[in-house]
A protein has these predicted regions:
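A short, local hydrophobic-aromatic micro-motif
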Residues: 7, 91, 151-156, 244
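Hydrophobic C-terminal alpha-helix "anchor/cap" residues
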Residues: 79, 83-84, 144-145, 192
């Protein structure tokens, strides 16, 4: 991806652990690499199709001076986040914050922290089979759409499906949402579980009924296997109620292990697997 580079932006701010750092202030320097597509701006010479690096510098200075932080890690994190939120053409950035006047009682050239942050593509499956199912789904998706570090991309239709896993219970309403997020996979999982709890989700029976179920299916092409999170979702290839809505909004997204697309996995499941999708008569959720 193309880059816009900013080097040595000088900012006077009041960050540091010691009281004198907060009181007197000191000079900080910022380097930034902005990852963006400059093609259209390069062909048309139109500023609105580019990222105004002057405005980026102004915003970084504003964020650095707006609050006082103990750690340069915190100052760098906040600065990177605000830039990514304010400039939609920037997909990713590298930011290095230098603190050359740090209170170190030995000769040194510089102290800095360097971070990389960016937007990530995630797919979340949603489902409900208790109470007012549409209400729970609408409320859950609304929570995700309104999260400051998430941007909704697409939401599938709602599919009526039979239960999966052998537990006798009511039919489900299921679908899939694509979003872009600045959250890490673990932060996104924490948010999904929080939204489930707010909807009264109780984990009493494995594959049992639930007011709201939110599963992280895919996160970029990441492969994660921990006690708390497995990505890609370990059973997604066996669930037509996941693959059908996923195929509707992103038929060519691929599984990181097998390389198979959602469309290919759904076709295989139609011939060899269980069928749970009953109909797709429901409209998309607002």
């Amino acid at each position: 991806m193309d880059q816009i580079r900013i080097k040595g932006l000088e900012i006077f701010a009041h960050h540091g652990v010691y009281p004198e750092e907060k009181e007197k202030g000191q000079h900080f320097f910022l380097d930034a690499v902005l990852y963006t597509d400059t093609r259209r701006a390069g062909l048309t010479d139109r500023l609105e199709l580019s990222t105004d690096y002057g405005e980026v510098c102004r915003l970084m200075n504003e964020v650095m001076c707006a609050q006082t932080y103990d750690l340069i890690e915190r100052a760098a994190e906040q600065t990177a986040q605000e830039v990514l939120l304010a400039f939609p053409l920037i997909r990713r950035l590298e930011l290095e914050l230098h603190k050359p006047e740090a209170p170190i009682p030995l000769p040194f050239g510089d102290v800095s922290v360097r971070i990389e942050r960016g937007w990530h593509r995630a797919f979340v499956a949603f489902g409900s089979n208790m109470g007012d199912k549409e209400y729970y789904l609408e409320k859950g998706l609304k929570e995700l759409k309104e999260h400051p570090l998430c941007r909704p991309v697409k939401v599938s239709k709602v599919y009526r499906t039979t239960p999966y896993g052998g537990v006798e219970q009511e039919d489900f309403l299921n679908g899939v949402m694509e979003l872009e997020t600045l959250l890490t996979p673990f932060e996104l999982l924490e948010k999904l579980q929080q939204v489930e709890r707010q909807a009264g989700r109780e984990r009493k029976v494995h594959w049992g009924p639930r007011t709201l179920d939110l599963d992280l299916l895919l996160y970029d092409d990441c492969v994660i296997d921990t006690e708390t999170l497995t990505v890609p979702h370990p059973d997604m290839q066996n669930r037509d109620f996941v693959l059908a809505p996923l195929c509707e909004i992103a038929p060519f997204v691929s599984h990181p292990f097998t390389g198979k697309t959602a469309k290919q996995m759904l076709e295989e499941l139609k011939h060899n697997g269980e069928k749970h999708v009953v109909d797709t008569a429901q409209n998309k959720l607002d």
